[in-house]
Each structure stands twice: as structure tokens, then as C-alpha cells.
Amino acid sequence: LPIAEVGAILKNHSAIFHTDAVQAYGSEVILPHELGIDLLSISAHKINGPKGVGFLFKSDAIQLPPLLHGGEQEEKRRAGTENLAGIIGMGTAVSLLTSTEKQARKTAYQSFQTIILKALEEANIDFSINGEPTNRLAHVLNLHLKGIPSDLLLMHLDLRGIAISTGSACTAGTVDPSHV
């Protein structure tokens, strides 16, 4: 379901709605209050910011218990020293990501998808798009290439300077399919 529909369904329930917006934040306009989102996670490295830092949007209606005890940071939810350089780097990356930049990225990614799909068709490669064929993020193209081992494809494309993944970061290093 689209995020707005999920938010509308959950609006009259006691469920807390969290969405992982790491992939979408760099190319989509996300308005948590309009979408009914209570919690939203973002990672800086997806928008050209530093690795290892992100942010959590929290609706004012949500109360979160502390993760670590012993300090006053983060409204008494997380004791410890924050990664100030990472936070500043992420803030800079966010400030540079205007709606015009998001649209430019989205347009470029859609062009890349069109080029890739056309090249596969012209090469008579048997493939299918996993998931929704039209309503998907412009920068995510999830394909099944029939009869081509993923490790072989990964190696050959890497040697040609093309970066792909054959699974999620959660399953890196394993050949087993994701449980999700």
C-alpha cells in the first residue's frame, strides 16, 4: 500500500506508524504529518552525507523511552557524546537537498532505468521486474535475470565499473534468500 493509505488506516488505531524512508528521502517529498507517519528514519549516506549518522523524525504525539540511561542528551533518551561532525555533515547534506535537486535526481534516475531496461530488451535478456512495475522509486530497479547467477553478474558488472547489489545490506555475505 502507498504510505498515505497506511497512515490513513492507522489514524484511528493505537498503532504507531514507523516508516524507513532511507531510500526515498533523496528523491521524494515526504511530509510526515500529511502522511500520518509517527516515526520516520533517514540515513545520511543516501543523500551524499557521512556514513553512520541519520535522524529519526518523531511526531509530538509519540513518547519514546530512553535507550541508554545516565545523561540529559536527546531529551533524556540517549546518554553519551553525539557524533558532532556527522550531525553537521548530515545537516549540510539535508540543506543542499532542495525540492529542485530531488526532482532532478528523480528525473535522472528514471532516465537510467529506461536506458537499462531498453538495453536488456535489445540484448534479448530474459528478465522481469520484481515488485510494482510502475509505482516504484526511480532510483531502485529490482530485477530478476533468468538463468544468470547473481554472483557472476555482480563480478562482471563490477569489472566494468557498474555497481549493483544482489540483496539487501542485511543479507550481505550470504547466498541465502532474504526472509522478508
Predicted region positions:
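Pyridoxal 5′-phosphate
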Residues: 1-180
